[in-house]
């Protein structure tokens, strides 16, 4: 079942998504998140995680980095985003040490 769902998402990515401008507020995109969630967590949990992500992807949310977590959850992966932001701040400090 998981492979069939991934096949449908890949079809969307290839044939439907290019017809519209990019609107996803997250990285990875919602469709890529769905494929990764299906691959990592199976058909049922992966579908639920992907649908929860799509529902979070709306204009009133700031978006950002939101990778698929290693454990099942319907919430945003805030730990990964915080680690990414901290790494980017350290990188910025190293590039501009006199700020």
Swiss-Prot record:
Keywords: Cell membrane, Membrane
GO cellular component: plasma membrane
Matching InterPro entries: Membr_insert_effic_factor_YidD
Domain of life: Bacteria
Chief localisation class: membrane
Subcellular location: Cell membrane
Keyword Cell membrane in annotation: yes
Any Pfam family hit: YidD
Record membrane topology: Peripheral membrane protein
S-S pairs: none
HAMAP family: UPF0161_YidD (MF_00386)
Record-stated family: Belongs to the UPF0161 family.
Protein purpose: Could be involved in insertion of integral membrane proteins into the membrane.
Name of the protein in question: Putative membrane protein insertion efficiency factor
């Amino acid at each position: 079942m998981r492979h069939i769902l991934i096949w449908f998402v890949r079809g969307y990515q290839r044939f439907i998504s290019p017809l519209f401008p990019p609107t996803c507020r997250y990285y990875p995109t919602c469709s890529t998140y769905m494929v990764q969630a299906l691959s990592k967590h199976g058909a049922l949990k992966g579908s639920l995680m992907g649908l929860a992500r799509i529902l979070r992807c709306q204009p009133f949310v700031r978006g950002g980095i939101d990778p698929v977590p290693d454990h099942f959850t319907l919430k945003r992966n805030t730990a990964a985003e915080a680690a990414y932001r901290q790494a980017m701040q350290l990188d910025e400090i190293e590039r501009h040490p006199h700020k």
